C-alpha cells in the first residue's frame, strides 16, 4: 500500500508568469509604454484626419444634389468628395506609420484651400459680371429702379463680404491644418527610429490601421 503524499511532496501551483514568463517581459512592457507615448501625436493626427475627412464628405454629399442645376456646385461638390477621399487615404498611410502620410494630408489641405479660394473668387467675379438679380423686378415696375439701385449695390457688397470671408477663413484654417500635418512628420520619424518593429506592427492593428 503506497503512502499518502505529505504536504511537502505537493508542489504549489505556479502562476503563468512563472511557468512561461508571460506574453511580455517587463522590458517589453516598458518599451510598449514608451512607444505609446511617442506615438500619441501621430495617433492624434489620425483622429484629426478622420474628422476632416467626414466633414468634407458630408459637405460634398450636401452640395452634389445642386450639381443638377449649377456647374459651380458640381465642381465644388466633386472637389469636396476628392478632398474627403484623399484625407482618408492619408489617414490610412499615417496609421500604417508610412512616412508619406503627413505629406499627403498636408498637401490635401492645401488643395482644399485652393478649392475654397477659387470658389470665393468666382463668387465675387460672378456677382460683379453677372446679371442684375433685381432686373426682373425693375423691368416689371420701372418706378422701383431708383429704390432698388442702392439694394443692388448692397448685393455686391454682401457678395464681397461673404466670399471674402470664405477666402480668408480657408487660408487660416486649411493653412493651419496643412502646417499641423506637415509637422507630424518629425514625430512619425522619431517614433519609427526609436520603436522596435514588433511594436510598430502591433500598434498598426490596435489603431485600426492594420489589415
What is the predicted function of each stretch?
Residues 2-211:
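Topology signature of small-to-medium multi-pass alpha-helical membrane proteins
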Amino acid at each position: 500500500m503506497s503512502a499518502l503524499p505529505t504536504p511537502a511532496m505537493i508542489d504549489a501551483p505556479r502562476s503563468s508568469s512563472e511557468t512561461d514568463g508571460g506574453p511580455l517581459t517587463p522590458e517589453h512592457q516598458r518599451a510598449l509604454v514608451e512607444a505609446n507615448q511617442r506615438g500619441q501625436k501621430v495617433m492624434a493626427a489620425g483622429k484629426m484626419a478622420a474628422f476632416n475627412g467626414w466633414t468634407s464628405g458630408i459637405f460634398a454629399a450636401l452640395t452634389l444634389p445642386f450639381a443638377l442645376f449649377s456647374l459651380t456646385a458640381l465642381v465644388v461638390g466633386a472637389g469636396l468628395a476628392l478632398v474627403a477621399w484623399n484625407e482618408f487615404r492619408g489617414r490610412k498611410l499615417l496609421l500604417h506609420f508610412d512616412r508619406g502620410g503627413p505629406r499627403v494630408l498636408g498637401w490635401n489641405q492645401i488643395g482644399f484651400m485652393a478649392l475654397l479660394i477659387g470658389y470665393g473668387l468666382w463668387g465675387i467675379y460672378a456677382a460683379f459680371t453677372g446679371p442684375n438679380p433685381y432686373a426682373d423686378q425693375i423691368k416689371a415696375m420701372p418706378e422701383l429702379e431708383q429704390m432698388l439701385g442702392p439694394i443692388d449695390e448692397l448685393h455686391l457688397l454682401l457678395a464681397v463680404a461673404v466670399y471674402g470671408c470664405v477666402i480668408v477663413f480657408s487660408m487660416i484654417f486649411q493653412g493651419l491644418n496643412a502646417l499641423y500635418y506637415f509637422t507630424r512628420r518629425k514625430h512619425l520619424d522619431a517614433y519609427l527610429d526609436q520603436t522596435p518593429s514588433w511594436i510598430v506592427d502591433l500598434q498598426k492593428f490596435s489603431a485600426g490601421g492594420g489589415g
